[in-house]
From Swiss-Prot:
Residue sites binding [4Fe-4S] cluster per the record: C47, C133, C231
Family (UniProt): Belongs to the IspH family.
Gene Ontology MF terms: 4 iron, 4 sulfur cluster binding; 4-hydroxy-3-methylbut-2-enyl diphosphate reductase activity; metal ion binding
Protein's job: Catalyzes the conversion of 1-hydroxy-2-methyl-2-(E)-butenyl 4-diphosphate (HMBPP) into a mixture of isopentenyl diphosphate (IPP) and dimethylallyl diphosphate (DMAPP). Acts in the terminal step of the DOXP/MEP pathway for isoprenoid precursor biosynthesis.
InterPro entries xrefs: LytB/IspH (IPR003451)
Descriptive protein name: 4-hydroxy-3-methylbut-2-enyl diphosphate reductase
Record's keyword annotation contains Manganese: no
Reaction it catalyzes: isopentenyl diphosphate + 2 oxidized [2Fe-2S]-[ferredoxin] + H2O = (2E)-4-hydroxy-3-methylbut-2-enyl diphosphate + 2 reduced [2Fe-2S]-[ferredoxin] + 2 H(+); dimethylallyl diphosphate + 2 oxidized [2Fe-2S]-[ferredoxin] + H2O = (2E)-4-hydroxy-3-methylbut-2-enyl diphosphate + 2 reduced [2Fe-2S]-[ferredoxin] + 2 H(+)
Domain of life: Bacteria
Binding site for (2E)-4-hydroxy-3-methylbut-2-enyl diphosphate: H78, H111, H161, T201, S259, S260, N261, S303
Amino acid sequence: MEAVQQNHSVCRGYCGVMLRSRSGGFFRRGFMLGNVEVILARPRGFCAGVERAVRTLESVASRYAGTREVYALHEIVHNLHVVNSFKKMGVKFVSALHEVPEGAVLVFSAHGVSQQIKEESRRKGLTVVDATCPLVTKVHLEIQRYDKSGYQVILVGHKGHREVEGSMGQVSNPVVLVQNVQDVQSIKTPSAAKLAYVTQTTLSMDDTAEIINALKLRFPQIVGPDLRDICYATQNRQTAVKAMSQMVDVVLAIGSKNSSNSNRLLDLAKAQNARAYLIDSYRNIDLEWLIGARRIGITAGASAPEILVQEVIDYLGLHANLKVRTMDGVSENITFKLPELD
């Protein structure tokens, strides 16, 4: 949005600052959207795994401030606000291990890494702090257990996602990646082979259930955890956004574009026929999205801090007479112990 001073002759004596939308329309600063009820999803925002990863990197950055360089392999969590905050603290984010000098401090992200990355880190003499979400670690252990027992492991997930890359690198044998029901029909393996599946933790429950059903139909002998690999926080946020989307005219899902779980929230809101938009922050909001909306729903992906939710509410309050309430939903009280620092 850019601020533009309106011509007094046009506005017949009143004026003030007008705001230009992305499509070129103008809106007066104030209550131009009228009375609007904002409904906040419960739960929303940080999950226990993200909270653990963020607090871990905070602790590491504080401990080694001014004495050793701190690196993080990939984004600690998939959220631009969080990553930029750590950059201001001096944390260096890298995309490959060769960018980390020998003897430095390295933090693994919440998404986990392959066994090869762990071994290379040891060879370089790095001080490693592993902030992998414990629920992702659980999937890693399942893959290792199935592989050791002679199963061909099938991973349901999104190609290129950091969590998927780390999970596929837990064993030396190939792991088959399945992204959709069509991929199930393309699996080349003997029909009587020992098969086991695991899933990425941040998938859509509905889509994953469909894929698992397709796997069981084609391979009746396949074993796996059903939907138990999809983390509790992902399930809770998806259930909440489904319910909330049926109450509102517009849904604002706060999260970065590379956040898998945030994108699933967006998809689910749209599936309920709500107008839905994924935003990194209030700066991405186009007021034209909200014209005619009497109820606006706000949710946030598991990597998005609550401050971003509050900033969106504050921004909407500049342009509407707001009433804010939180929907009924699950209260989360789970915490994960931080990794020990040497």
